[in-house]
Amino acid sequence: MANASGFFTHPSIPNLRSRIHVPVRVSGSGFCVSNRFSKRVLCSSVSSVDKDASSSPSQYQRPRLVPSGCKLIGCGSAVPSLLISNDDLAKIVDTNDEWIATRTGIRNRRVVSGKDSLVGLAVEAATKALEMAEVVPEDIDLVLMCTSTPDDLFGAAPQIQKALGCTKNPLAYDITAACSGFVLGLVSAACHIRGGGFKNVLVIGADSLSRFVDWTDRGTCILFGDAAGAVVVQACDIEDDGLFSFDVHSDGDGRRHLNASVKESQNDGESSSNGSVFGDFPPKQSSYSCIQMNGKEVFRFAVKCVPQSIESALQKAGLPASAIDWLLLHQANQRIIDSVATRLHFPPERVISNLANYGNTSAASIPLALDEAVRSGKVKPGHTIATSGFGAGLTWGSAIMRWR
């Protein structure tokens, strides 16, 4: 029957809250899991299930299986064609190749130009990942776009979903966590698979920080490049699980060390017809400042927090450092990478780095480096990787995962 508000209500229903006991616990890896295998549950927005699922809205129902494992089965990457070398930068700011390479390890970076777009790079990377995974766009259940620099204020994931041809209209949304974004994307994908019944999740890390750089500031313009990287995370049997554990954190107090804030509006007072003053209304169109960074503080933060985070993730996974085949860090600065590897006692030959060729590509750096390592044959099926992202927020997170 309809109530006064016009909504339909049911007759009184006994309160079952006190009878519901959900057998869920938090595992050592940080994921929520069931204490026992749950029954098959159909998730749908439709109230009734038609016997002929192929001819009714219930065809979009998806089985929810808990617990479930998840694994990485494909990767891809894309970079703009425009290459800017250290020598090129020396023509516009007071710097040189030796100064940049010594302090950062960076030699070149790629920058968007002309008709390049972040969505275009993301689609290219995602297409390559899908091809490697042998998954068609129609079978993607979720698109996660990890970026701080979308082409559209309201996000880029739905545009990517459309461009890829995901005809079943899967959920697509952005994750904003700066250079930690991709790791948080992996965690989000795993949570959706383990608890939401999703099978194939596309995780993309892509950023174009060159659009927010002050190209007259040699302290920041030398660091950043543009790129996109993607992986396909797929549901699997729990015994084949390939994402063993994670460790994630934020510290808002550290925002002062790395940020790109909204510029303050400068409004003239406006008087209405009755003489009242509107003051700052209506606001003028806002924009973001260029990236502001205290490099020394960011370095201290990274070399302290990242090793602790990786050690915590290893402990949750029940693995010693010796079980890790590769250390894959966010490609921010070679000094940071070397310092973290030293503190964790990882030899240089087990550390993945492509920073020299691309610079700091923010959320794209980890999947970009992973894709190159996989396609070059360095990372092989069955290899275990410790990865960690860290950056603005401040945010940082680590994951222990197995490739395929």
Swiss-Prot record:
Positions of disulphide bridges: none
Pfam families assigned: ACP_syn_III (PF08545), ACP_syn_III_C (PF08541)
Pathway: Lipid metabolism; fatty acid biosynthesis
Superkingdom: Eukaryota
Cellular location(s): Plastid, Chloroplast
GO cellular component: chloroplast; chloroplast stroma
Subcellular location, principal: plastid
GO MF annotation, one: 3-oxoacyl-[acyl-carrier-protein] synthase activity
InterPro entries given in the database record: ACP_syn_III_C (IPR013747), ACP_syn_III_N (IPR013751), FabH (IPR004655), Thiolase-like (IPR016039)
Top EC class, one word: transferase
Reaction equation(s) it catalyzes: malonyl-[ACP] + acetyl-CoA + H(+) = 3-oxobutanoyl-[ACP] + CO2 + CoA
Enzyme Commission number, as recorded: 2.3.1.180
Keywords: Chloroplast, Fatty acid biosynthesis, Fatty acid metabolism, Lipid biosynthesis, Lipid metabolism, Plastid, Transferase, Transit peptide
Function: Catalyzes the condensation reaction of fatty acid synthesis by the addition to an acyl acceptor of two carbons from malonyl-ACP. KAS III catalyzes the first condensation reaction which initiates fatty acid synthesis and may therefore play a role in governing the total rate of fatty acid production. Possesses both acetoacetyl-ACP synthase and acetyl transacylase activities.
Family: Belongs to the thiolase-like superfamily. FabH family.
PANTHER family reported in the protein's UniProt record: 3-OXOACYL-[ACYL-CARRIER-PROTEIN] SYNTHASE, BETA-KETOACYL-[ACYL-CARRIER-PROTEIN] SYNTHASE III, CHLOROPLASTIC
Protein name: Beta-ketoacyl-[acyl-carrier-protein] synthase III, chloroplastic
